[in-house]
Amino acid sequence: MATTSEINNDLSFSVVSIVEDVLQQHSSRSSDVGLVSRKVEESSLRRYEAAGWLRDMIGVSNGKDFPGEPSEEEFRLGLRSGIVLCNVLNKVNPGSVSKVVEAPDDVADGAALSAFQYFENIRNFLVAIEEMGLPSFEASDMEKGGKSIRIVNCILALKSYSEWKLKGENGPWRYGSNMKHNFGSRKLFLRKSSEPFVSSISRTQSTDMLSTDQPLSSDGDSRSINGLVRSFIADRKHEDIPNVVESVLNKVMEEVQQRLSIHNEMMKSSSKPIPEDDSSCETVVRSQLCDARQHEEAEENSPPQVVEKKFQRTNFEHHEEQKILLNQQKHIQELKQTLYTTKAGMKLLQMKYQEDFFHLGKHLNGLAYAATGYKRVLEENRKLYNLVQDLKGNIRVYCRVRPFLPGQESGGLSAVEDIDEGTITIRVPSKYGKAGQKPFMFNKVFGPSATQEEVFSDMQPLVRSVLDGYNVCIFAYGQTGSGKTFTMTGPKELTEESLGVNYRALADLFLLSNQRKDTTSYEISVQMLEIYNEQVRDLLAQDGQTKRLEIRNNSHNGINVPEASLVPVSSTDDVIQLMDLGHMNRAVSSTAMNDRSSRSHSCVTVHVQGRDLTSGSILHGSMHLVDLAGSERVDKSEVTGDRLKEAQHINKSLSALGDVISSLSQKTSHVPYRNSKLTQLLQDSLGGSAKTLMFVHISPEPDTLGETISTLKFAERVGSVELGAARVNKDNSEVKELKEQIANLKMALVRKGNGNDVQPTAIPINRERISRRRSLETPTIRPKLPTMGNTSNNSRPQIMDLSGPEAFNDSTASSRRHSLDIHELMKSSSPAWPRQPLNGKDEDRESKSGEWIDKHEELIQNQNPNSPEQFYQSMVPQQQSLYGGKQDFEVQSITDNESDEAATSDCSDSDLLWRLSVQVNVPKVSNIQNSANPKPKKIQPRTAKLSETRSLIPSLIPAPSKRPPNTVNSQPQRPTRDGKRRLSLGT
């Protein structure tokens, strides 16, 4: 019995396990389909419930009956107009929708509605629902593809609210607690059939737990299997049940046969045969089959109408799913086509962009090459322009616009309209004439944002030319408060970025001189002067005395104020100390227009002397850095007392500067340099051979527009002045030697002419050097000398005129002159004469001097090479004929610059004697027979009153006693095209 019970337990356990496995497999396959179908069925039942309640509430509307069990499309079309919803809401809560827009009776269900009707009814319904606190939906849910489940929820909530009101509004209304859904008998059947399934599972679990202790009876096994089968097929369709039962039976039979075969083998091997008894298994299978048949019969006995409806509903849902699937596939195909088109377009765009980039690169390369060429041409043009400016001698004019000071911003308004490379445009209002924009052109224009370094870098080549032997003048001009002192010096608190032109210029000179120290040795010294109330004062005086200093133009070493302190400097620190000392001594005060107004003109003069270590030649250069005091109007500056006197002197000196510029621009014969100490100090720069730069400053404030326009007009007039090409101040050893030889010869001639029988000093003449220099020089005009064979009285030498007014235009007061009498000159020694630059004529004079020496030696050799006394005796008749009789004279060329210089400049005794040594040509002997007993005449000095001087200069050569009738020319002629001016002199 024990063995039989074990076999039964084994078989019963196996049958239950097999049934559970088969049911789990079928449940896993159909779980998804069942879940979807249950959800669809549940939503349909809710929709039917909502439609039934609406049908009960409104009945027939507009001759149309609302369907009791509509589909989603029918449900949406019935509610799309909003009339049904608004009417139901007014019945539940009267007055919720004040106005319902009715539709015509003949409008079909799917026809398009008017926009007003559609939006008015639906909007009013949704507003009222939200005010009542009920679940709402979107207006788009009424369209095709919308979420109808939200419409159903809203209607069911409204139904629950209506039922709550009908019950007397007992307690607070809650939609979740009050909502009762009646899903029909089918739902109740599902709910009832689920209970034995749960109980069967619990029983199966308890049976499994107790299987090891107690044997199971056949009745319990059959009940457990029956419960499992019933619970599984409860929610299945009719067509699925036979398949499930068949699979269960097949599986059970296979398992039973396998178990029986194993059991038979075990029985054969045992000693006691066990009778086969499979009655329990057959009983279980039969019971399950009976239950399945009963369930099928129950399903078949259900009404055919319900089955038909379910079938139609399933087909409709299947068709809807097919439509959705087809639409999705269609959208996928469209997206694929769009993606393909986009990729093709992107490839085309990529190719096009690559082509465009290639062409753009070629174009940019061409532009870059053109820009490089343009910069190169622009730089070359700038160099050529500067070269032309140097050759013409034009005064360079730079303009700088001061930025607005803190607290002076006038709402962004500025008198300056536009600033270009070399043009500045001023906005001119109507009160200054014709309103509009007026441009002014200069060499360079700096805007308010320009730095000190940018300003100096543009004038750096001009500053460096001082080391090459040129004279340079840079002066700042403008009204008071326009930033002149800031440009030239810098602010009160100096930094490396704010250093002015004065500091930067000297630092650059030190740097360049240090670079050239292997070839040239430079000595740099500084003077610092100021012109205060028309008095020249030394700002570097250690004792603090303000003694009056004299200005001497055309001095041999370029120092126009020799009495001022000349301090050698070798570094930037020395310059800063000197500048600080000068700024402390300079006159500065406060006015209504400027807190630190300069009350004087400041001039920093840098003297440079360089010596070439190879040739020994000496270069002289000077640079004037002038900070002019600003012009000011007394009514604006509000000055009185001493400040008023200072302003008057400042305006007077600036007015004199304007007169000088006007005369130079008009190229008049007389330039009034002596009208002011300022113009007298700047005479060498304005009328000489210097490179001059005027830095004009203006203010951007509209209040100073009048002064700005006048300043710019004056600067334009300055830019039109031509001074002539600048010259290098250079002395070489050959010129110095020739000057000494000519001075010794002239002194010997003068002594012999006075009857002093003095043997001349032997003068060594370096013929090789003279011939080499003559070969390098250009041909010059030689004086006409008669031949030895011509002994007639008509053969008279031509000499330069020294007695006329043109020869002594450069004159000063007699109190500052040394005596030029011949007797006093004889008593003095003959030192080496320094070279005096006389407007570019030094080279011509040197060549003429060399030629005169050649003629002089040839004359001595022809007369008597062994008797030098005879040569000096033969010069006595020449002296006699020199002062008596008819003479013709030739004057060398004098340029306009010389005449301008000579009109107002001082002339020292060394300058005059140098002119005598160069211009006077000794004539040849006209009569050798009368040279034995010479009768020298005593020289009678004659004074000539000059037109523009205050002193009388004695003439070295008296005028002839008779005036030629046809050769008198009282007025100097205008210079011809070749620059020559010839005069005939009489008494």
From Swiss-Prot:
Keywords: ATP-binding, Coiled coil, Cytoplasm, Cytoskeleton, Microtubule, Motor protein, Nucleotide-binding
Main location class: cytoplasm
Domain Kinesin motor: 394-721
Region entry Disordered, spans: 201-221, 759-849, 927-987
Bias-annotated ranges (Polar residues): 788-797, 964-974
PROSITE patterns: CH, KINESIN_MOTOR_1, KINESIN_MOTOR_2
Swiss-Prot/TrEMBL GO biological process terms: microtubule-based movement
InterPro entries xrefs: CH_dom (IPR001715), CH_dom_sf (IPR036872), Kinesin-like_fam (IPR027640), Kinesin_motor_CS (IPR019821), Kinesin_motor_dom (IPR001752), Kinesin_motor_dom_sf (IPR036961), P-loop_NTPase (IPR027417)
Recorded superkingdom: Eukaryota
Coiled-coil features, chain-numbered ranges: 725-754
Compartment annotation: Cytoplasm, Cytoskeleton
Calponin-homology (CH) domain location: 44-163
Biased composition (Basic and acidic residues): 840-849
Tissue: Flower specific.
Membership in a protein family: Belongs to the TRAFAC class myosin-kinesin ATPase superfamily. Kinesin family. KIN-14 subfamily.
Function as written in the Swiss-Prot or TrEMBL entry: Microtubule-binding motor protein.
Name of the protein described by the UniProt record: Kinesin-like protein KIN-14G
Provenance organism: Arabidopsis thaliana
Phylogenetic classification of the source organism: Eukaryota, Viridiplantae, Streptophyta, Embryophyta, Tracheophyta
